[in-house]
């Protein structure tokens, strides 16, 4: 034994507690904390305790001992010992819980914790409502019922608060947990709200008298089961909510949709209305796509005078500064992609907004550029041919052609017609094109590469393919993509694409039966989210009614692959992954079909390819040819021709923030490093 170390320990007699009073040092408390933090991991409690010896001194604050133990755990994280992340997460959670208990005792309406140190749930709810964190409208159950539900469903699972790695704890605390919440509170409250909405969208009398227990002294078993089902899947991390739901649901007038795409008209009132709409959407937590195809080109006509229009660049500057000013509920920076078609006369100016050099006031460095190309452009590239750029204002007013609305053969015919009109003269009774440019298609592509080298964008949206594979191609045009390129459906000036997201977390879902169960619940929750969400604008509300777009995504695929010894590269492994996602799609369509039969189809169902029995833009023979499973696609195709609740159903989002909160790999992305550090503005 080291006698010097022993003598040093004997000199340390007191520690200072959080309230300032001295207490004799008790090493058993340090041991107990280390034992708890390392329990069930391959990390050593003794190693954690011994690393504190040089940090402890006489008169040290107990809070410092706790913080130092957490830092020691963080310092031990390595590719060979990743479970120190869990140890550090538990220690961080213990600190957070202690801080929140103190907040409860010192709030304007102080309340004590229970005998086990947990917050009294009824007083917790009242505190959250009083302090503006929760909307009281969500908590109409009697206090006794709320406590009964919590004690029955969530309280026995309080250990799940300690199932998060340190990066997940920090993400949850900095971005999503409100007031005195713990992860357990968060998932229970969300589950309660979803369950209440589930029954309120069905028979109201059943909801009030038989199911919810609002008018009874006993909660119905059906209601309890529904809350428990949602809570179990959320708290076991089998489903992952997007940032906007984690941060907004339980607040008044919450927008719960993540993705929006709007189209600018070519008039001042409409332009400024959409700018305001985008500000509201960003404030409410949405990521935005903005299509600029209809904006008249630089030097087009303005009030009848040719050469006076300023084009898309000044509008982009307005949008750029708007995203800096209006963030996403304080959780994220404002985020927008601006899309422009490759035939637009301003396309080169559009690209130069993110190139180095030039006028600073023409730069829009905080936007994400998106170029929209028809197949005709790619053909011009292949043959090293010319490419014509047009002003949308001129061709609409002279020829009645809205070029942005067209795709496929209709676009090709209109485009060829306009090229011929560039060769006409003023004597042509049909008119002629005055404002146009002729460039090499490859020169435009090279210009996009110059911008991409500087900024990483633009990304390309291939318009013909996007619209041709859409199940909604007869219901309107998809002019461009959303910010993260996973969600897009027909939209227009008066109908802003609006989509609600949620992901299944593959590494926590084992069997096919479990995958089906989780997927069905996920689609159910997505549908309830549309009902619960307060659409930020009227055009968003219209799109919800017409298409009812939701996006079921995936998370943690790399972790699931590793757990099942699968590689992204080997063909037979790819078949296994493909089968997994085919099942996911089948179960999602199956549940949406059932909800459509029960609650009604989305507004434009009759105009959609679902009505023809097509699934995700594919006919039955094509689906069966590509199938890697024995699922009954024949029966499902017949069913969807009669009912579908959602016009848009699946969307694999990047979900980097929410995957950090769960503690799994992002989306379907491979893991490229055993250990990495991600820094954000909030930690």
Tell me what each language-model feature is.
Residues 1-683:
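Extended catalytic cores of very large enzyme megasubunits
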